[in-house]
């Protein structure tokens, strides 16, 4: 889907058909190894020179940026945002790294920017003997720097720095993809609205004490960010000259973390990511 969105190619003609992790490189699912060796980051790359939204807009005279998840190439390939038409990039090159909202680092163009978070590999379970009903059992899954916060700061910075000229920004926020992680004050707001609920193990991601409340908090968080961006565009006097498109890269997905049925995410349709048919 990311390949199709970036290149405009129909899925049947797209270069990338799946999340190819290129496992021949080594133990790509070992996050400690990936922290030590950046060549293990990233997924199957686009071919060098492939036209993208970024390159086409840059040729048209726009300053281009991508902020967020890349996932179609890695630092050691010819398919990085900067090589694929984006003047500026900030975010997570590798989609596996995006499976934690408190990562130890992000990428700024071609270099890592280290954050004040410790590595906590996705799939890390609760401590042995921890009570899954005790909110404090989940404390280790919340760290210092919430990556959507600093991505959003870069969004506002880019808009401000380029307010006097044409710009194209592709903001590929990881929200609301699993795992379920959101600022606690927003989570508690929905805990009060929804009431108590069963925790989840978060298979392959992280456990969550309040998965429905956390998912709702993530949606609200992103909604507020979009509202803040609109307000900033108006403050800068460029709102009337700006086009905003909000889209998803796939249908609703639970990923064993949030309930698409409970939220009626595809309503009035059934199913979700992968296929949808009318009810």
Feature annotation, model-predicted:
Residues 1-279:
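Formylglycine-dependent sulfatase
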């Amino acid at each position: 889907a990311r390949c199709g969105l970036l290149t405009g190619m129909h899925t049947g003609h797209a270069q990338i058909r799946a999340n190819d992790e290129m496992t021949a490189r080594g133990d790509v699912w070992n996050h400690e190894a990936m922290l030590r060796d950046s060549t293990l980051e990233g997924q199957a790359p686009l071919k060098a020179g492939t036209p993208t939204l970024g390159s086409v807009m840059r040729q048209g005279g726009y300053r281009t940026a991508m902020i967020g998840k890349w996932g179609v190439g890695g630092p050691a390939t010819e398919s990085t945002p900067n090589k694929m038409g984006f003047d500026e990039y900030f975010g997570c090159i590798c989609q596996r790294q995006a499976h934690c909202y408190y990562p130890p680092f992000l990428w700024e163009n071609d270099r890592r920017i280290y954050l004040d978070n410790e590595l906590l590999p996705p799939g890390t379970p609760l401590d042995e003997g921890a009570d899954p009903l005790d909110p404090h059992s989940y404390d280790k899954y919340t760290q210092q720097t919430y990556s959507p916060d600093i991505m959003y700061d870069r969004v506002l910075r880019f808009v401000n720095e380029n307010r006097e000229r044409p710009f194209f920004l592709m903001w590929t926020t990881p929200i609301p993809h699993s795992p379920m992680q959101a600022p606690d004050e927003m989570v508690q707001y929905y805990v009060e609205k929804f009431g108590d609920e069963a925790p989840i193990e978060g298979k392959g991601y992280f456990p969550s004490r309040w998965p429905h409340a956390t998912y709702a908090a993530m949606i609200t968080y992103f909604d507020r960010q979009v509202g803040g961006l609109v307000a900033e565009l108006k403050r800068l006097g460029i709102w009337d000259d700006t086009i905003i498109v909000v889209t998803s890269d796939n249908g609703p997905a639970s990923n064993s973390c949030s309930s698409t049925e409970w939220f009626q995410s595809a309503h009035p349709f059934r199913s979700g990511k992968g296929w949808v048919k009318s009810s």
